[in-house]
A protein has these predicted regions:
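Generic alpha-helix structural propensity
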Residues: 23, 36-40, 50, 54-58, ...
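Secondary-structure boundary/capping signal
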Residues: 36-37, 119, 283, 296
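Alpha-helix initiation and N-capping motif
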Residues: 9, 22-25, 38, 52, ...
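Active-site-proximal, Lys/Arg-enriched surface segment
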Residues: 12-15, 45, 49-123, 128
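Alpha-helix boundary/capping residues
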Residues: 32, 48, 62, 275-278, ...
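Single, function-defining residue in the core of a domain
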Residues: 2-5, 14, 19, 86, ...
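Gly/serine-rich nucleotide phosphate-binding loop at the start of the catalytic core
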Residues: 1-48, 52
Length: 327
């Protein structure tokens, strides 16, 4: 990246953080009294498409200042809705688990490193649905990604470890709690995780039960709260600690979450306290969308949309730096 492009990234990410309305090349040029032209901004956004490797180069010095063995690595995805933007391989229809429906927008997957009360993105993927197929039920053309989000999840974790990031646990929600992901983290990468399970997952209460195929659904177990129990999950060879936590929702109702941890030496409080750190990724998503102008760009191509997303990440990192220095 030339000095001009570094300066433009710095300027453009400042612009995203400072803006309240739409962010455009013309708007930035006018704000700078023409010192930066519309064409310069357009060329910057249309340049080489930014990747997770570029993000790591950008954030690495900051991560090294806060990294610790007690950190957590959080994997999660979100959708930036773009209902009025022309469809392409990244602006397309995705299933939104929160809304339980299909929405049009950019589906992004992040690896967020949380250490010493600072949250920094250290990897990302924009889900690109590059394959066109015909839905057998409706006869309509649809898009799909040749790479699953679970595969991207593993790649983000693998890359974080390759980048020598120390962390105590990988954290993720129920959508990434596959047996395959668990085995990848514990057996291949030699790391530990905490994650929730769907209530229909099958578990055995001893190695002997597992060997004899005696499994039962999670929601049929009689489990006390505030204690842990060693279990064997169907499809996973190694034991896990199971913790049942009862929580109160905003509307006053109660819910139950079943958490499993691959480190069988820790307590109930350690499991639940660490998993609560996953909330940081929700704060990150909210800040990225509301404070870094993620949705306020009229960019139309995959490259300009990707580079705008990258600049929004850089804007978020600046805000996190400012918040960190004010603590």
């Amino acid at each position: 990246m030339s000095m001009e492009r570094k300066e433009l990234l710095d300027l453009y990410s400042d612009y995203l953080v400072a803006s309240f309305g739409s962010t455009t090349a013309t708007g930035l040029s006018q704000l700078m009294d023409g010192e930066v032209s519309h064409d310069q901004v357009t060329r910057f956004l249309s340049g080489t498409k930014k990747t997770a490797a570029d993000l790591w180069c950008h954030v690495k010095p900051l991560v090294r200042q806060i990294q610790s063995d007690a950190a957590v690595l959080i994997i999660d995805d979100s959708i930036e809705e773009k209902p009025y933007t022309d469809e392409n391989e990244i602006v397309c229809w995705h299933y939104d688990h929160a809304k339980n429906q299909q929405v049009k927008g950019i589906n992004f997957l992040s690896a967020l490193y949380y250490s010493q009360e600072v949250s920094l993105p250290v990897g990302f993927e924009l889900i690109a649905k590059t394959e066109i197929y015909v839905d057998s039920k409706t006869g309509k053309q649809k898009r799909r990604s040749p790479i699953t989000k679970n595969e991207y999840c593993k790649e983000l974790i693998r890359q974080a470890i390759h980048n020598q990031l120390p962390f105590r646990f990988a954290l993720f929600d129920v959508w990434f709690s596959s047996s395959d992901n668990m085995k990848f983290i514990k057996q291949q990468q030699k790391r530990d995780f905490v994650c929730p399970l769907k209530t229909n997952r099958k578990v055995a209460l001893s190695r002997q039960d597992k060997g004899q195929g005696r499994y039962q659904r999670l929601d049929t177990l009689e489990l006390e709260t505030n204690v842990v129990r060693e279990i064997y999950l169907e499809g996973v060879e190694f034991p896990l600690l199971l913790a049942k936590e009862i929580f109160t929702n905003e509307d006053g109702s109660t819910g139950i979450i079943y958490l499993v941890c691959s480190d069988t030496s820790i307590s109930f409080d350690e499991i639940t306290t660490n998993y609560r750190k996953r909330w940081q990724v929700e704060c990150y998503h909210k800040s990225l969308k509301q404070n870094a102008s993620l949705a306020k760009s009229p960019t139309q191509t995959v490259t300009t949309q990707t580079n705008h997303f990258f600049a929004a990440l850089c804007g978020y990192i600046k805000l996190e730096q400012l918040e960190g220095t004010s603590k």
